[in-house]
Amino acid sequence: MGKTLIYLIGFPGSGKFTTAKELCKIIGAVIASNNLFNNIIFDIVKLQNAEVPDDLWEKIFAVRENVLAILEKHYVKSKHYIFTNELIEGDPYDQRLYNSVVNLSKKMDMEIFSVVLHCNNEKLVRRVQSEERYQENKITDPDFAIKKIEGKRLFIPEGSLEIDNSNLSAKEVAKKIVEEMKKEKNGKLIKTSVTNHLKTERTRG
């Protein structure tokens, strides 16, 4: 199986990072979660369960770009890579995040395989309150989490694998992803391109 950049997309509490860890038990992979970049800043300013100002998001994006530039030159060629993000349809900041990962996959000469995780609100509320999320400086306030995603839809890249994991374990989801990767290993993954057609106004919380 050729090396792949797996892009896990979902709302807070949908199980992106937990699924990524389960994937690492099946395939040799390196996780580059959104919190890897965000917590460089969030660990200093402590904005858990709070709105993040736009200017701070821009500084986080600058940190991210520098880390990706390092990764481009020094990535482990024998490993798959797993990225995670909450990408909102119509959000220009999230468009930039997505485009940066697409561009990185091209520079690393890896196919990009997007997986969108869907989860009902009842399970999101339950999952978002976990102790593990608190330790990782993630959103843990269920009311804030639901308000943050209210009226928003996930961005679904062309060719994405969509999984409703409301009643699935992370291990089951990881197995589904690997099975799909094996089906597509002979160059059948849909080529993912940079997007430039989203709205200009910002909708990110």
Per-region residue spans from a language model:
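Hydrophobic anchor at the beta1->P-loop junction of P-loop NTPases
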Residues: L8
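P-loop (Walker A) phosphate-binding loop of NTP-binding proteins
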Residues: F11
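ATP-binding Walker
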Residues: S14
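Walker A/P-loop
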Residues: F17
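Glycine-rich phosphate-binding loop used to anchor ATP phosphates in small-molecule kinases
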Residues: K59-F113
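Conserved phosphate-donor/acceptor-positioning beta-strand/loop module used by diverse small-molecule
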Residues: K106-V128
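Small-molecule kinase domains that catalyze NTP-dependent phosphoryl transfer to phosphate-bearing small molecules
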Residues: R126, S130-K176, K191-E201
